[in-house]
Amino acid sequence: MATNFNMMNSTTSITETTPSRMQYYRMHLRTITNGLEEMAKAAGRTKYTCNQLLRECYNLVDAEFHTYEEWKEMGAFVKRGQHAYLFWGKPTTSETGYRYYPIEFLFCREQVQFKEVQ
């Protein structure tokens, strides 16, 4: 007799068992950052911030970065197929008093195009 093994019981929903998109991005960024910090420490480069190390990892040290909304306000649009670079934002305190670093989704100048003036 075959037994049907259900991974979820009736009180567990899909969202409780799989991380949200933001949780995935946070885990991904944390993993990259931890690796970069370990490599920087081993190389004696301890004065660099996480975001400076990420810029080096992305090979965009001197690039100009802005959010989608900021580029839009400047009259530019993100080119089709471009994906945002992940960076850590400034520390924020939630309504419950929890302090955390938000994720910033930034695009560099090479990823945008300014609208043509007619």
Across the structure, where does each feature detected by a protein language model lie?
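N-terminal accessory/interface modules of nucleic-acid-binding and processing proteins
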Residues: A2-Q118
